Structure formats: structure tokens, C-alpha cells
């Protein structure tokens, strides 16, 4: 056995990782299960050689792949160059005859395509011959492509021609052709073909316009004469209302209203002439604007001539004439469908109204209960009026801002053919889900985090001294009597890696965290004094660690003491289920012998912690919003609520909105374990925080929210739920309600914690209780120890829902207060058979006495008075029964019980009284409750003892 080595020792000597050594050893067929397994020297050499050989093989393989890649790169590049030859000065640099033949075939194909296109050009261009020349052989490939693109663009223009292009082509046709170079001949020869066709159509339009003008002038002249004879006062009676509706144009003030009919006829002619081509569209606003202005000027001149022929003065008559035209134009606009705008264009009546853009309906829609019509219309891209109309046809009258129920929303969506999907509302106040789910974490951003280590052990076994040596500070000297007075969290750095330590007095925080489902500890260091051995709190620490499921590292301390015996400590620990790795390689614990006082083997202990942490592969994502657990909390008179937090995921920053347990706030200050202020804290970092609205409890979770509004809403919601749960919470198991709980099937075993004055009494009591036989029920001894009932016993009983039996011992003052707060049942006895009889009687449901609640009075709060240093006094009026000083009271607000407690004081006017009768006024204070408001109801009751039926 002396020549054997453990895997972790080989890793230290060679610098290789434990994982590689274990994997290589297993591949070689050696019996190796973990880094703690032992191998012979010969096997160790084979394992090291195997790891190095594997590494060299991988390196050689990579080198071969790199060489092969370098050989393949030139061939690939060469093939790409052959497929796409480079061109210099318009000539393709190609030497391969196959590629030359391919280029030749492409040029011949282009020639054939141009030859096929020539007959089309002859049909369109009847006046000019074809000028295009075939592509020469010496012409480069790029030039041929450019020529082909130009020809395609010109042919595309032949199909769609705008009226603006028609006017331009008329001017181009009249001019002489300029002298062009050979490069531009092809593009110029294509244009006249299209221009000749368009010019013919433009000439036809001009002839039609010229033919229509004389009739129009004659009609205008007769119309003006008739209007002047009627003195401009009679409405137009010529029966051409349609002409009015189309001819009323306020741009042309001197134009008669009856001209609209002829104008409409001309528009029809335009449409008929333009309909010869299916693809061309004529736009009157573009081509006839200038001509219309010329015609208007001629009309004005003709009106002046008419005035002279009538032998009347020009001034007044022109005014009347203009007024008549304006009046007729206004009348025509009344009949026009397009509206009566002042600058309405008469040609716009033929333009169709712009239709609303059509939006396709979504396949499905995720809706919320309470959505209104406007929200649904916006989601499915429809008008609210359309949805309101549908609902009206279904028999439901709503407006667009009215909230709809679930059935109505689904009915509307199904009517449109949209699948309704109810939105699952996420409970943002439930921060506990963040500790169970990890879907919000980014796997690519996960980094290694420091291990969180809890130091546990018996009193005065050297826990704080050990942590003091780790931190290289003098924490122990500052504590009263050398005993830890508070829970601390500290961080140290060793071998380039950080370790976070939790120092716990009596392990309350550890048990409290486990009771609330929090798991913050990764590793437990169990400190045992080599001279004292295993003590009661040592066994308690072992039970806590196993219940939490964290690995244990045993540190046998005080080797410098004369009576130190590490072998005896190891033997005693094995009796409680803690075995060394040498004895149990799979489930064993690491044992390290140290002396914290003389700094002996502390480096080995830290290396062991890092080794266990490496095996666990602890990782966290620092990029998300921070979550973590409360280690300690207290109320400071100057700073307010102060909480010691441990960040588990993400990064916590100053001014972050945060929810801690049932309270909320904004991070005001953050202090690290050295008392220095910091601006951010990453994973596994302990910090002390201020800025909370109330003091949280140890073990509560915290989470950072996106803004303060969301944090406030979540905190208030959590506080409301906690208060509701507290009211509805069933009573803890005690001897009074044990039988009822057993009948309801809520308990299959009775958990008991035994504390006695001597070890023999504790063992005898445990054996006697386990012999009690009740059908379907068994007694489970959670913990048995010697000494007074402490706070740690109360915490353990609260976590395991156990009953504490004290035999010849009493609870401490703090333990008694905590038991009342945690509602833990404590039974104190000095005779064993009475303990057995009481437990057996409780299990059979025959425990006396039994109490019944009796309501004796009811009162309503009329006024409240806040007295400094005293509290809130409620002035009340008794409406039924009476209020007595020795009774209990429930505070009811809006039908909900918000507090249940005793009456602290009772007064009638200024006198202290024992009771206040019906229809009388008085004042009272409720014990430990000051949130009394006007109109609250006091329900006064007493617990009356009754005899239990046997």
C-alpha cells in the first residue's frame, strides 16, 4: 500500500487535470472511480504515458490536416480562375481551348438572337432602315453583355410610354439627327421605332381637339348671351346637369358652367383614342394643361367681343358676367360627387378613390381577458366600427373602449377565422421560479463561479479562528468572549481562485435556508477538535449537511493540543455516517488534519476545497439580472433595514430595483466583506445592502426587476400573499391537534426531537417512544442530544415539523421566543413514563383538555389616535355583547381578518376598566399591532376549556 498513489497526487506532480487522468485510467482497464482512487507506481506511469500519447496523437493529426488543407487551396483557386477568366484591356486571358470554344458558342448564340429580332424591328420601324451591326469576333465579352442589356431596356420602353415622353418625341422627330459615334449607333437606331408610333397617336389627338373647338366657342357665345339677358339671376335651365357636374372648375373663373358637357365629350375622345393601345394610359392633367389655359384666354376675348356687340358698357357687364360664371360653377359643384371644394378639379371625378390597404388576417391571436374592441381591431388590422357592427348583428351592443369577456373575444376571432389563444399570465412576483428554472440563463455566457463554503462544528472547536486565518484578519479578537455573535459571509482568494465562506453561529441560518427551500451552500467544512472529538453540535451539523445534500470536508483541528487523537475522531465520525475517502471512495469525505492556531496544513485544506469544487463544476451567468439569498438581516437605527445577501446568478448593481422576500426597494449602498463600498457584485459574492423598505428574513430569496414600478408591485403582491397564507396556515403539529391531523391523513409519522440532561436518559426515552404501537403511525426520532433546548433545536423542529420533548432540561430565553414565533410545540417532563403516556394518548386522540372559541362581543372603530412611544389607540363603540380586558380580539377589515391578538389595554374615557358594555364607547390598544383604521371591526372572543369525550 505504501507504493500506491492517488490520482489527485499524480495530477499535482505532473500538472495534468484529474478528469484526463481518470478517463485514461478507465480506458486502460484500471479500477479507478474518481480522483481519490489509488493506483500503483507502474499503473501511474502507464496512465501518464497514455495521457501524453493521446495529446501527441491529436497534435500530429491536426498538423496533417493543416498540410492537407494547404495542398488543396491552390487547386481550388486555380479552378476558380479557369471558370472565370480575368480580362485585361477588354481581352479575355484564356489559354484553354475548351473555354475559347465555349465563348465562341455564346457569341454565335447572341448573333442568332439578334437575327431573330430583326423582323420585329422592321414591322415597327417603317421609315428608317436597321443600322445595328453584328458583334465582331475581337470584341470582348464584357462589351457584348453591355450591348445586350441596352437592347433589352429599349425594348421594354416600347411597351409603356408616358404622355411626357410623347411631347418630347415630337420635338426630337422634327430635329435633324446629330452625328454620333459608332458606340452609340445601336441605342439611337432603336428609339425612332417607338417614337414614330407615338407621334401618330399624338397627331390624331390634336386633330380631334381642333375639330371640337369651333362648336365649343359657338356654344359658349350663345350661353353668355342667354345668361346676360336673364340678368344673371335665374339658375341654369338648359338641362345639362351632367355637364355642370363635370364642368364646374373654379380655376377658370371666366369659363361658362355649361361647357362641362363638351369637355366631357372631349375626355371621352381622349379615352377612345388611347384605348387602341392596351398598355398605354393617357393622363389629361399632363398633356392638356397648357392648351386649356390658351382656350380660357380665347374665351375671355370672345366674352369681351360679345359685350361690345351688345352695345353695353364693358365695366359693369364684365362684373356681372364674372358673377354669373362663379354662381353657375358653384351650382355645378353642388351636384358634383367629388365634393364642393374651392379648388376642386373637374377632371378628378374620373379618378377612382384610393382604396384602403388590405391586410391579411393573422392565423391566430393571443388575447387577454378584458381587451376592448379597439385592441382587437388593432391586432387583426380591422376597423373598430366593423367589429362593433358584427357584435351588434350578434345581439351585443358595445363601444370601442368597453372591456369584453372571454367568450365574446373568442366569438369575434372565430367569426373572422382567427384561432383564439388565451395568453398565459406570468406571475412576475413569483421569484422562486428563477431558482428552479434555468431557461433564462445563457449557456454561452456561463462562467466558473467561486464555491460557497459553510464552516460548521461544535462550540469552541475553532470555526472562527480558522476563518480568521483564511481572511488574515482579527475577527476573533473583536467578538465578545470569542464566540461568534452574528452570521458573516466572507470571500478569500487562493491559487488565483476565490472561495466564499459562511460563518454560522449554531447553524440557524443553514437550517432556516433549508426550511425555505434555499440551497446556497456548495461545500461544508466540519470542524472537529482533535482533543474533544465528536460533540452534540457536531452530530447536529452532520445531520444538517446530509439533509441539504452537500459534500462534507472534515477538518480535524487543534493538533497542537497535548491530548489530540485524530484516529479517535475518525472512528467516532464513522459511527455517524461520515467515512474517509480511503474507506469509501464513492461516498467518502475528505479528511484534513490542521491547526488553525499555528497555521498548519491550511493550504492543504484550501486545495481540497478547490478540488471538490472542480469536481462539482460550479457555473453561473453574470449577464442576467441578479438573484440570490438572504444570509442575515437586521434593523439599524441610522441606516434602516440592512441585509447580508449572497448573489447566486447575474450581477447586482447600485440603484437596481430589487425584491427581497416580502419587501422591496432600490439598492442604495453595497459593502463587501472588508467594509469597502462597491458598485457591482457578481455570482457567489457576499455583500451588505441598504435601501429596503422592511427587514427580510434569513433564507429569503431576492431578485432584481426591470424597473422600480414592477419591483414595488411584486413586493406588495408578495406581502399580501404572505399575510393571506399566514391567516390560512394550518397549525403546526402538536400534541393537541395530532390526532385530528392523523385522521386527515396529513401525517404518517410523528417527528420528535429529544433533549435530555444525560445521554443515558436520552437513549432510554428514544427507545421507549419508538416502541409505541399505533396502527398506521410511527414515531421518528429526528434528533437526540444532551443539553438545554437551544435556538438550533427550534429551527430544526420548524424545518422538520417536529415536537420537542425536554427531559430535565429547559429552553433558553431566545429559544422560547423563537418557539413562539415558529409555533413549535415544546413539552417538558421529568418522568419517562409520563412522556410515553402523553405521546401515546395524543396519538390515540384522547388528550385532555380541549378548548372551544366563544365570541363575547363586537365593536366598530370610530376614531384612531397615534401616541408617540405608545402606539395607536382605537376609539370604538360596542354594537353587540361586551369587550373584556382578558379576552382576545380579531381586527376585521372589509370582511377579512388582518390581525388576531390579545388586548394590551382597555379604557372607558380616561379610566382603565376590565370591560366595556353594550352601546358604550371606549378605547383599546391591540398587542403588537398599530395598523388600526376607522370602520375596522373588533371581534372579541375567549377560549373556553371543555372536557374531551373519551
From Swiss-Prot:
Region annotation G3: where it falls in the sequence: 503-506
Region listing for G5, in residue ranges: 595-597
Binding sites annotated in the UniProt record for GTP: 457-464, 503-507, 557-560
Compositional bias of kind Basic and acidic residues: 128-156, 165-186, 200-234, 291-312
Region (Disordered): 128-352
Annotated Gene Ontology cellular component terms: cytosol
Residue stretches making up the tr-type G domain: 448-619
Annotated region described as G2, given as residue ranges: 482-486
Physiological role: One of the essential components for the initiation of protein synthesis. Protects formylmethionyl-tRNA from spontaneous hydrolysis and promotes its binding to the 30S ribosomal subunits. Also involved in the hydrolysis of GTP during the formation of the 70S ribosomal complex.
Name of this protein: Translation initiation factor IF-2
Natural source organism: Lactococcus lactis subsp. cremoris
Gene (UniProt): infB
